[in-house]
Curated annotation (Swiss-Prot):
GO terms for molecular function: RNA binding; structural constituent of ribosome. The keyword Ribonucleoprotein applies. GO terms for biological process: maturation of LSU-rRNA from tricistronic rRNA transcript (SSU-rRNA, 5.8S rRNA, LSU-rRNA). It comes from Candida albicans (strain SC5314 / ATCC MYA-2876). Keywords: Cytoplasm, Ribonucleoprotein, Ribosomal protein. This is Large ribosomal subunit protein uL30. GO terms for cellular component: cell surface; cytosolic large ribosomal subunit. Residues 9-26 have a biased composition (Basic and acidic residues). It holds the Pfam family Ribosomal_L30_N. Signal peptide: none annotated. Residues 1-32 are annotated as: Disordered. It comes from the Eukaryota. The lineage of its organism: Eukaryota, Fungi, Dikarya, Ascomycota, Saccharomycotina. It is found in: Cytoplasm.
Length: 241
């Protein structure tokens, strides 16, 4: 029985298709290996961060015990980070505090942002103090905010941080590949804090459970809600998150 030869053009086409399929399979294999390696890097970093946080916490506890044992006082390190949330309205705001609220991207009620605490930012926040509540967020508060209400600015769009790939695509050039990298950069106020802060969309919080205090617009130390509440910001954020 005679063998039917395929036309040369068909043979060439089949060879090209086979070559393309082989190249795709090879590329897929490389991608799979790269993704596996990346997952390992992300996992190892998260474990290292947890170890770092735990050791820092133990160090503070030990320092406090040592201070107590020697009959002296433990002085907390100067805070480097604040979380600022706008709690007062739109109307009749003088130009200076209005400008500060715009600079902080607090253009809506219950919007919140992380701010690196410096002399300059402290003075800015002071100008806006009658309209905001702020304080020193804990690691737990930062993590809860980012995981529950974290959105990034991608091509001027508000995109949920539902995948590490979104973070890597926008912050990978700063070696920030995952949501835990992002949280670590905020909590430690790392070298790329500004880039991370600018990438994060202002957090949209809710009115606190049970509402604000009756004297909401007085300073916190006077029984109101505005101004610096130091560590007590964590309780407010928990109510609003």
């Amino acid at each position: 029985m005679a063998t039917t030869l395929k036309p040369e053009t068909l043979q060439k086409k089949e060879k090209a298709q086979q070559k393309t399929a082989e190249e795709r399979a090879a590329a897929k294999k490389v991608r799979k290996a790269a993704n596996k390696e990346k997952r390992k890097v992300i996992f190892d970093r998260a474990a290292a961060y947890q170890k770092e946080y735990t050791e820092a916490e133990r160090s503070v506890i030990k320092a406090k015990r040592d201070a107590k044992a020697s009959n002296s006082y433990y002085v907390d390190a100067q805070p480097k980070l604040v979380f600022v949330v706008r709690i007062k309205g739109i109307n009749k705001i003088p130009p200076k505090p209005r400008k500060v609220l715009q600079l902080l991207r607090l253009t809506q009620i219950n919007a919140g942002v992380f701010v690196r605490l410096t002399k300059a930012t402290s003075e800015l926040i002071k100008l806006a103090e009658p309209y905001v509540a702020y304080g020193y967020p804990s690691l737990s508060t930062i993590r809860q905010l980012v995981y529950k209400r974290g959105f990034g600015k991608v091509n001027k769009q508000r995109i949920a941080l539902s995948d590490n790939a979104i973070i890597e695509a926008n912050l990978g050039k700063f070696n920030i590949l995952s949501i835990e990298d992002l949280i670590h950069e905020i909590y430690t106020v790392g070298p790329n804090f500004k880039q991370v802060s600018n990438f994060l969309w202002p957090f949209k919080l809710s009115n606190p459970n049970g509402g604000f205090r009756a004297r909401k617009f007085q300073h916190f130390i006077q029984g109101g809600d505005t101004g610096n509440r130091e560590q007590f910001i964590n309780a407010l954020v928990k109510q609003m998150n």
